[in-house]
Amino acid sequence: MPIQVLPPQLANQIAAGEVVERPASVVKELVENSLDAGATRIDIDIERGGAKLIRIRDNGCGIKKDELALALARHATSKIASLDDLEAIISLGFRGEALASISSVSRLTLTSRTAEQQEAWQAYAEGRDMDVTVKPAAHPVGTTLEVLDLFYNTPARRKFLRTEKTEFSHIDEIIRRIALARFDVTINLSHNGKIVRQYRAVPEGGQKERRLGAICGTAFLEQALAIEWQHGDLTLRGWVADPNHTTPALAEIQYCYVNGRMMRDRLINHAIRQACEDKLGADQQPAFVLYLEIDPHQVDVNVHPAKHEVRFHQSRLVHDFIYQGVLSVLQQQLETPLPLDDEPQPAPRSIPENRVAAGRNHFAEPAAREPVAPRYTPAPASGSRPAAPWPNAQPGYQKQQGEVYRQLLQTPAPMQKLKAPEPQEPALAANSQSFGRVLTIVHSDCALLERDGNISLLALPVAERWLRQVQLTPGEAPVCAQPLLIPLRLKVSGEEKSALEKAQSALAELGIDFQSDAQHVTIRAVPLPLRQQNLQILIPELIGYLAKQSVFEPGNIAQWIARNLMSEHAQWSMAQAITLLADVERLCPQLVKTPPGGLLQSVDLHPAIKALKDE
């Protein structure tokens, strides 16, 4: 067979294979055209699940008479004219393929009138060459599209249609999604002459929750947590259901929109799932209705035939932004206040990944982990489920070890000055600048040391805490601040805001930079030791601590932070121990000369040697 140009009708039918999957696809394309035309009311009439009739009527701007023929031609559009337009799409449609593709597999008529015209005109395409006929018609300002006998000329496609009920359910779902995207538009849906859905427009500043409840149900509305999150050109709004009360029925509600366009994007879903994972079971899914607004130049919508997917130019930034936005609203729902100074502190543990600072986008579900105890375990309220473990947590210390270390990690009185540790062990030689040689690691968190023939055990977490305290305590110059990739925004009370403002200069010396407004505080930078911490937990604790203080000394605040930082290591290796001791010997020489209690313990081998000799 020789190479030849395909007839227009056949070419359009091939294109329809990508655009027109089922009646719901037709409804989606036509309703989006109505929205692009500025319609505030859209009426949708369906017969026999869309196989017999799809009629879309709107009150948009309409189409001029001399443009009707072009409207039914392939690659004819009013929405873009250059590559620059394509790279900054703000309309829902832009390819100019929908009407031509639909008309090639159905009997389509387009009737329209603009406000400037005195009469309406009707256009339809027919024949092998898809010639367009235009004739006068009666119609108000706006456009009506009728699609009759879908797939009448492609029997192979028609036989793949499901039952009337199934096809209409897909149409109903599409309308639900569109109604959630445009609260300002009235949408009416009827099937076989019976009105099925009536979504009335919500005025500016009106109660969007009414339409949300009508579409997603009262169960979702009762558990919905409102989100309002912004950073630069990124804005996240919407609702996420409380993960503690998620049900299988609620989990079906997963609606996401990017610049008003409904999406099924893996990156967005992964960010939301990761934010909720500590409260969800392995077989549970989050429920959400979220709207992401982003600079059109930073997103490519021309990557999927049906425009269901997008590609972000800065996917890592978008992922972390959504993750933090969802996580922040979940953190604000904690019903029990976090324990501060009066509760026993657990032993340090390994750090969960901080999405605020880390900036890495692992586009895969985290590996399965064994359940571990949560960082805080307040008594659950009656009828509520126990608190879920924090992700990435590792087993902590034994109870006896934790009690010993807890006693060492007590916050000093507010007026107490930062002092060098009191010697609890015999002082080393005056010229000593080393703890000795690391022989091995004992019980995963103690280093067995040898120096001048003497053996001792060193508690690595305690050494790590003292090192951090020195790193956090400002010297002649303030501690260097490390800007966060995405600032952390938290809601604070009036008392907490007042305490933060009083402590602002002290916090600035520690490298903590923040900005406050009426009811929120935005953390913009933290010192290096805090970069890999979970700031969603640490910063609210710090604010609570400051609210109870009357004097704000950088040294006391640094000591409190050092006490509350989580350990970087669940199990220490020889290399990690050697590196830590080298840093301690360099930055904390007083610990070498006068070890504090709980840091170093001499090991007397004489009883063991004597016992061996007696044998």
Curated annotation (Swiss-Prot):
Biased composition (Low complexity): 364-391
GO molecular function, one term: ATP binding
Region named Disordered: 363-397
Keyword annotations of the record: DNA damage, DNA repair
Primary role: This protein is involved in the repair of mismatches in DNA. It is required for dam-dependent methyl-directed DNA mismatch repair. May act as a 'molecular matchmaker', a protein that promotes the formation of a stable complex between two or more DNA-binding proteins in an ATP-dependent manner without itself being part of a final effector complex.
Family designation: Belongs to the DNA mismatch repair MutL/HexB family.
Record protein name field: DNA mismatch repair protein MutL
Organism, scientific name: Shigella boydii serotype 4 (strain Sb227)
